[in-house]
């Protein structure tokens, strides 16, 4: 490490003067600098310029942008948000439930949903992907805002880049999957069941002669029951027979799901992408309003393909260019049995970083905005102490741990309710 010295206009890097042992929690470095008080503003200015260089990455198709993201992802591999414990750090949270990707906390009338970097498929966690939680959360926020003309949603606020605070509601135990293409590699994917000879799936009659990745004649609904272990395909008639929803609820949610998907297809195609399939979850608020919950049109809940190369690759029998987690699924299927093997191989680091890039590429492409990469260097500084009469200032230079940042932001948000 090094210390900063010089006048406000001529800051220089000097060898470190003092290094104290940091706590593992904050990973802080105490350094003595020769800065005078008047130099603080210069340090602040320098940090802002450095930060903007790192995070202001605009959407670009050139290799330089992809390289920047891959480098940033590689540097964050050991700092992913794989687990949270806000029930231990935020006052007022009543309990925690751990999903495959999200940690959900009960806050009375609201739920605090923390989107982690955990990557799930085949009903289990496969890896942790840098920036993934932030990408999913911010992608959903964008779509929640854009789809309010179709359906209300449970969003209340987003106090942190990984956090959504939502209205508490009774979630229907059904996931509404909408598809336009026959594809996939999981047990419940349309291509898997079709290849096994099934021609009536979730109440949909499928014609003979379809091939993988082919476009269907219309959008179709293929619901599944929600389960902690394994989702089970179910038809609309079975949903009613099992008492999972009333007919009115089923009709309303089905119409909303199809309308959301149609709108998502339109937005995706306008930006050079194909929304292949996706899943939605809905709940009922205390006043009876049916609302969209969880996430919407993220690369975790959806498949996206590059539009301009789809037809040529399909005609050649080549897998479409995808902008989702399908290529990671395929890697695991080629190297193990992800459903039955007790221990899975570790995903290659270059594959993990590539997935981080694809998720960010999707966010930037859909939203036409830049993705703010978290600063992986010194995030902020604090005045530690000033020895009287010494003319020196000691600074605490620190990268704020992700969990501390989330704790701070969630605590502030809940205190305002």
Feature map (PLM): residue ranges:
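N-terminal mitochondrial targeting presequences
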Residues: 2-6, 38, 46-76
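A long amphipathic alpha-helix within ATP-dependent nucleotide-binding catalytic cores
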Residues: 245-276
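Catalytic activation segment of kinase domains across protein kinase-like and atypical kinase folds
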Residues: 281-326
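Short Pro/Gly-enriched beta-strand edge/turn motifs at strand-loop
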Residues: 10, 17-18, 80-91, 259-264
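Active-site loop/lid in soluble adenylation, ligation, and acyl-transfer enzymes
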Residues: 64-227, 338-417
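N-terminal chloroplast transit peptides
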Residues: 1-45
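Short glycine/proline-rich, acidic loop/turn segments that cap or connect secondary-structure elements
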Residues: 7-10, 319-339
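Beta-rich nucleic-acid/ligand-interaction surfaces
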Residues: 161-162, 274-292, 381-383
């Amino acid at each position: 490490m090094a210390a900063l010295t010089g006048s406000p206009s001529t800051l220089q890097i000097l060898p470190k003067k003092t290094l104290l042992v940091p706590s593992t929690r904050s990973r802080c470095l105490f350094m003595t600098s020769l800065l005078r008080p008047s130099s603080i503003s210069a340090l602040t200015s320098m940090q802002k310029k450095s930060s903007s260089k790192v995070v202001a990455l605009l959407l670009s198709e050139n290799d330089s942008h992809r390289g920047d993201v891959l480098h940033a992802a590689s540097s964050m591999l050991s700092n992913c948000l794989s687990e949270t414990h806000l029930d231990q750090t935020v006052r007022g949270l009543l309990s925690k439930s751990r999903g495959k990707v999200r940690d959900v906390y009960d806050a009375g009338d609201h739920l605090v949903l923390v989107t982690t970097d955990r990557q799930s498929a085949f009903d289990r966690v496969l890896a942790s992907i840098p920036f993934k939680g932030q990408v999913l959360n911010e992608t959903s926020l964008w779509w929640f805002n854009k789809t309010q003309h179709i359906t209300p949603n449970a969003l209340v606020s987003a106090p942190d880049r990984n956090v959504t605070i939502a209205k508490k509601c009774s979630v229907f135990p059904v996931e509404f999957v909408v598809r336009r293409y026959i594809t996939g590699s999981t047990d419940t994917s349309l291509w898997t069941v079709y290849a096994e000879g099934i021609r009536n799936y979730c109440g949909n009659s499928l014609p003979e002669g379809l091939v993988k990745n082919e476009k269907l004649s219309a959008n179709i609904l293929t619901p599944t029951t929600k389960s902690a272990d394994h989702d089970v395909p179910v038809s609309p008639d079975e949903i009613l027979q099992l008492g999972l929803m009333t007919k009115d609820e089923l009709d309303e949610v089905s119409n909303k799901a199809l309308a959301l998907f149609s709108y998502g297809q339109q937005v995706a195609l306008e930006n050079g992408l194909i929304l292949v399939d996706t899943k939605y979850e809905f709940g009922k608020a205390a006043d009876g309003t049916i609302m969209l919950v969880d996430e919407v049109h993220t690369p975790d809940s959806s498949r996206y393909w590059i539009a301009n190369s789809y037809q040529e690759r399909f005609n050649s029998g080549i897998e479409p260019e995808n902008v989702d987690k399908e290529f990671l699924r395929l890697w695991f299927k080629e190297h193990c049995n992800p459903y039955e093997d007790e221990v899975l191989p570790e995903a290659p680091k270059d594959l993990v970083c590539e997935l981080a890039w694809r998720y960010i590429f999707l966010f930037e492409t859909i939203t036409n905005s830049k993705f703010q990469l978290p600063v992986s260097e010194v995030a902020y500084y604090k005045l530690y102490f000033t020895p009287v009469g010494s003319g020196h200032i000691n600074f605490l230079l620190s990268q704020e741990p992700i969990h501390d940042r989330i704790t701070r932001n969630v605590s502030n948000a809940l205190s305002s309710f």
